[in-house]
């Protein structure tokens, strides 16, 4: 985050020079100093990718509860990004805001077909996230104006097909296996769709089931970690563990580095190269953490996506961080005894789903709970 913050002058320069807008936007393929390096233009020069960087700032606030960081870092970064995107959006015949051009990384590779009918679900999900989160930021800082809500209200809803779920764009569905699940950004990593909502549930199920149906032929290493997260979004621990096992067995070198292709020729995908990249290892680790702990809207759930194979095995973790800086430590023994300790780093209230109760703590306070499977019944 400090690195991204240090590149704000370059982001402002690129927004002005390339897009002709105010605000800030980094090139999506850049050198260490923030200079544009180029690449397939529909992805390397896509302005909505900047919103993914914004999410990193907000996630830091969400998991720390640091209001000073929200005020001095998150709000300025989001606002500068929104200034760029707002100028690029144009009102269509139906009154909805659309980008001049739209894509969905890396659908159709670098062919002309990769320019999708605006707005792609990738772009649209990120735009909704940007303006909706700005509304939340203003509310949390006590200075709501209604401005960002008015912009978000002029964005169309996500494009959905009843059988295949989230579409690529308003007039195109995903018809073949592909390494990027960019059309599913609203599920992961943006977490805009909630499985507990019946309407969202049907969209999530259709989207994930369709990806599974198309198969992993054109997936690469990071696809398996991403699919694990999509399975976790619907509490499918078995499905998540299956994808993580495939990732670890077929895409990691002996030293743990991710090599992106099925370099052992095991048959799990059609790519057999071995380019080293870092992000997929982090993605898989993130998926494991989300199997252990879910934290949304101050509702905390331990083992939200527990695989069947873990049911009778000991499980333990210490000081995983939930929303508003709540530190969670948990242990389950093989004979079904559970212990949970929560410690606050900020004042707050949280609902503990596993114990079905609210806990209110001041910074530095902790609370412990114990139960057995019989108690729970």
What annotation goes with each model-predicted range?
Residues 80-137:
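Acidic/histidine-rich catalytic neighborhood
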Residues 8, 30-32, 101-106, 191:
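Short, flexible loop/turn elements at secondary-structure junctions
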